[in-house]
Amino acid sequence: MSDYKHTLNLPETEFPMRGDLAKREPNMLKRWYDQDLYGAIRRAKAGKPSFILHDGPPYANGSIHIGHSVNKILKDIIIKSKGLSGFDSPYVPGWDCHGLPIELKVEGMVGKPGEKVSAAEFRAECRKYAKTQIEAQKTDFIRLGVLGDWEHPYLTMDFGTEANIIRSMAKIVENGHLHKGSKPVHWCTDCGSALAEAEVEYYDKNSPSIDVRFKAVDEAGVAAKFDCAEGHTGKGPISAVIWTTTPWTLPANRGIAMHADLDYALVQVEGEHPERLILAAELVKDVMDRAGIEQFHNLGYAKGAALELLRFNHPFYSFDVPVVLGDHVTLDAGTGAVHTAPGHGQEDFVVGQKYGLEVANPVGSNGVYLPDTELFAGQHVFKANASVVEVLTERGALLHHKVFNHSYPHCWRHKTPIIFRATPQWFISMEQKGLRQRALEEIERIEQDGIKQHGQSGWVPAWGKNRIQAMVENRPDWCISRQRTWGVPISLFVHKETQELHPESVRLMHEVAKRVEQSGIQAWWDLDKAELLGSDADLYDKVPDTLDVWFDSGSTHSSVVDARPEFNGNPADMYLEGSDQHRGWFMSSLMIGVAMKDKAPYNQVLTHGFTVDGQGRKMSKSIGNVVSPQDVMNKLGADILRLWVASTDYTGEMTVSDEILKRSADAYRRIRNTARFLLANLNGFNPATDMVAPADMVVVDRWAVGRAKAVQAEIMAAFDEYNFHGVTQKLMQFCSIEMGSFYLDVIKDRQYTAKADSLARRSCQTALYHIAEAMVRWMAPIMSFTADEIWALLPGERGEFVFTEEWYDGLFGLEAGETLNDDFWAEILTVRGEVNKALEVARGEKRIGGSLQAELTLFAKPALAARLNALADELRFVLLTSKAKVVSVDAAPADAVATERDDLWLSVAQSAAAKCDRCWHHVEDVGTIAGHEEICGRCVTNVEGDGETRQFA
């Protein structure tokens, strides 16, 4: 018996079946960096149209988490796909380096500035700490396969960037957007200073709970707003009732907040002293119960919106206050009307800004009422609560009073209760130079430009526009000053007596920026005023405040994008961050861009959702559901993480768990197996000498290349629309269905058994080559490591890296006018699906083993029969049976198997012919050829003759 194995073209490749990514990816990374891959991409793309994705800087503190990974991977997918689309797309990663979290870490290590270390030493320690954090995060970002200028990232603490931040501030001052005002901050009366959110802890505390009457100025006008029955508007004075747990803030009251959409009742209280009270309709019974009022009824109702700007008398001062509307008003407790003191609460401040209410602050830094505070001067606020209650009682304004225990903010150092207190701050005004209106116009422009240029809104997903629009419409002036040590100085000089800015502030800020560019922000604190102000030095103070860190990152379009040479002066095309950044970086960048240049700093804004576990819960160490990107990379590899990111619809919450990642790993294996089949069957193929011209190729091979061409068009469009889960779906479908379930199955016989250099086999290899060239590029933005691995093993001359290439342009397909066109093969696929079902039944009934044991009869109506007969004897290769005969439907026996098609019945029989040892087909001529008794005539031709001819399959 002869052994024909050596006559077969068995697949062979160095591309392993197992990715073993966790072990092998680091070596690939090393090669990328040893060979300066990022530089190679820049050189290859030089002179192409630019696409700039500006990196929103993560904060330089702590390890990267799964959300960071999602963000960086999405950016990397876009950058790489833009490169393939013919753009020069440099990527400069950045870090946000100033601010409180780093200060707190450094305080824990060296103590507070001004205690054990000087402020200058403290800043130096902060800089050093930020550097260590950046290095750790950088290592993890690089490990994700993210390509960028990691050797030269931008840091907001680089001297040049710090200087440019000051220059950005100078431009805003020059354009007239800056003003000085007051803003409430957490204030510790023991520290005598403002506290940041992170310095506040919550403990239980006893506080007074009071309901207070504010009497209406115009009772008839107020009553008229309610839908009372005619002539039944009640009797007695009308009061709006507010509830508060901080009576000491009532001296600063400047308004009563109600909710526009809530129903309010005008309540008649009966008895010896009748009165009418305004309360939220749902809370009337609660208020009456706690006030001990039994006889009452509702006279009428009005929406909060109808009561806007009605005026009520302050309970103990001789002025009146308006009703204002705010979304912070709820029915959770109280009366539905909220005491509003803009100097003592953040929500009060925001609503107060909207209505132009005075930001009154009668309280000094030590928690004592200022000397000019009527009734309460010199009292400590917490001790004054009792005095306020006493005054309210005397004036007949107190409806109810009790003491209750609740959670209250305390200073983390002193463990003592804190207050909200308005302090002088610097603001970017939303109104004084029309900033709000221009920002809203830019939001609209971004949407419209996107539709014109890309067929979709510049806000991706489109709901992002409404979100940021609502925020801009309602946002107060931006408080940009902070009383911190580690931050970019606001760099202003103010007159000691008038508190006015120096008339040459803009020039002076540019002078400060020059010094900061040389030696960093410490230059400001080391600066002797006389150096810049000369003889005026004694008249002016240096403002000690630092800039809000959101100003640092929000001005990077100017301090980084405008400054880096690789961006060639082009503005950013895209900003891409998590959905929390509508309030954060997207907002601060928009405000600064419009304030500086009258233009948004981006053309497109892409938003991704947050990561949650498989049950939709937030990641939490206490729940134990945290998925660490480092763990995923160490176990499964970065390409699995990247495939998960791409496969997930990022427009909503992104679910991740071990089980979900396992599914990504399974999908990855299917794609890898397809790639391995392509490479293994390109063994011995040299495109320079073995390529077959399209006109000479076997028809099904041209069909397969045509399918790749169609899929490539869909994939390119999906990349352009940032629809990455669409890309992965199309790639999976192509690998699993069109290739795996059909084409790669059909060609195995020809690929393995045809003469090695025959047209039949070279045609097939030509198709596989074109498909592999296209597919490796589709994969490259997402499964970058695997694409690099495939690229290195593809035959033919090529550059070192797939990432310097563009989409493959060598694809072609069948012409629509051909008989065996795409529609023909689509029908063949449905017929094959029906045949497979019939073969499966026969296999289940033990009538056949493999499909090659089957002889198939297809009973077809004339039109289908004609199409099937177009494949002649090659129909059996398409259906993977040893024989396939097409017969008129009229000849179908009663036991023919019906199919889901109304023009096809099938009959499956076991072949009586012997099996060819080489191709495994059952053929009558096996055993009839002298010297080759074990194989069929077709195989003899392929082994000894010129090789078989294939036209169709």
From Swiss-Prot:
Bilayer-spanning residue ranges: none
Top-level taxon: Bacteria
Alphabetized GO MF terms: aminoacyl-tRNA deacylase activity; ATP binding; isoleucine-tRNA ligase activity; tRNA binding; zinc ion binding
Binding-site residues for L-isoleucyl-5'-AMP, renumbered to this chain: E577
Motif window: 'KMSKS' region: 618-622
One Pfam family from the record: tRNA-synt_1
Subcellular location: Cytoplasm
Reactions catalysed, as given in the entry: tRNA(Ile) + L-isoleucine + ATP = L-isoleucyl-tRNA(Ile) + AMP + diphosphate
Signal peptide bounds: none
EC number: 6.1.1.5
Sequence positions that bind Zn(2+): C916, C919, C936, C939
Family: Belongs to the class-I aminoacyl-tRNA synthetase family. IleS type 1 subfamily.
HAMAP family linked to this entry: Ile_tRNA_synth_type1
Listed name of the protein: Isoleucine--tRNA ligase
Species: Aeromonas hydrophila subsp. hydrophila (strain ATCC 7966 / DSM 30187 / BCRC 13018 / CCUG 14551 / JCM 1027 / KCTC 2358 / NCIMB 9240 / NCTC 8049)
Lineage of the organism: Bacteria, Pseudomonadati, Pseudomonadota, Gammaproteobacteria, Aeromonadales
Gene: ileS
